[in-house]
């Protein structure tokens, strides 16, 4: 086995490095043990691709910064457009919902109380007028009574009559 090692070294030294080294396969006649030859980096050559020397390193950095700046400006413009559209949409919605926001239930309650009082007075005055006419002997149809002004209470009266 030791006699084989110098032969391998002489074989490596006799062959010049090529792109495809000629390796002879081991045959079974040489011995029962198979030996593998290892190749050193000096004997094999790889594709000799080199990175070109960048003479203008600042130009590459400048191009990269320019592209980054353009992308940033486009991104900011898109963000501003989306922000403005959102503000306009919210403003439009606010104007549509403004009557709901300005609703004050206390003011509405005061108006309803006034109408109820007026309606009660009108009903009391109609009953008083009807009883006065009955005592005087004049009969009038309900349709001939004093005209009532229409109010929102008509709807509440109908609702109260339904629930009663």
From Swiss-Prot:
User: Per its UniProt entry, which superkingdom is the organism in?
Assistant: Eukaryota
- Can you tell me which residues the record assigns to a coiled coil? 106-130
Stretches that traverse the bilayer: 64-84
Alphabetical keyword list: Coiled coil, Membrane, Transmembrane, Transmembrane helix
Q: Where is the composition biased (Polar residues)?
A: 1-17
Q: Name one GO cellular component term.
A: membrane
* Location of region: Disordered: 1-48
Q: Where in the cell is it found?
A: Membrane
**Compositionally biased, Low complexity: which spans?**
24-45
Q: How does it sit in the membrane?
A: Single-pass membrane protein
Protein name per UniProt: Uncharacterized protein C3orf18 homolog
Species annotation = Mus musculus
